[in-house]
Amino acid sequence: MAIHGIFFGSDTGNTENIAKMIQKQLGKDVADVHDIAKSSKEDLEAYDILLLGIPTWYYGEAQCDWDDFFPTLEEIDFNGKLVALFGCGDQEDYAEYFCDALGTIRDIIEPRGATIDADWPTAGYHFQASKGLADDDHFVGLAIDEDRHPELTADRVEKWVKQISEELHLDEILNA
């Protein structure tokens, strides 16, 4: 088993593809990828470092598999766990709800002890509002728009993986 658990929910395949891009950059021996629809509480508890991928649907709704998993997520003690979030949204058609699900999942795991890191700058995005903001200038995690700007995805993922590797001290953990 790898030391990082990447968990995603996806209806269209976009968030799954992002999860696999992240795994490829980190290394398959370092990160396991799991579909949240096929995951259990014990699957998440097995990792000290979690990367959680959640897309936002329509008017700020969480993807259905995550929505179904939220009661289980509420049972997990996240104390001692490092968490980085990533998510997909549509900043044009749903500009007032862009990546809201990032905020939804943060609001579930943060009170349960999760240390959430890896904020991502809002610069370069064009949206009206988001519950997925850490502050006025940052999302709580990586925000991806595969609907409007798929050409930016690979570069954003690469930069974010480098960022989380530094912020979560992944090199130190791997070499310990």
Curated annotation (Swiss-Prot):
Coiled coil: none annotated. GO terms for molecular function: electron transfer activity; FMN binding. SUPFAM superfamilies: Flavoproteins. InterPro entries: Flavodoxin (IPR050619), Flavodoxin/NO_synth (IPR008254), Flavodoxin_CS (IPR001226), Flavodoxin_lc (IPR010086), Flavoprotein-like_sf (IPR029039). Signal peptide: none annotated. The keyword Kinase does not apply. It comes from the Bacteria. The keyword Ribonucleoprotein does not apply. Residues 4-165 form the Flavodoxin-like domain. Keywords: Electron transport, Flavoprotein, FMN, Transport. Its cofactor is FMN. Belongs to the flavodoxin family. Low-potential electron donor to a number of redox enzymes. This is Flavodoxin 1. The gene is fldA.
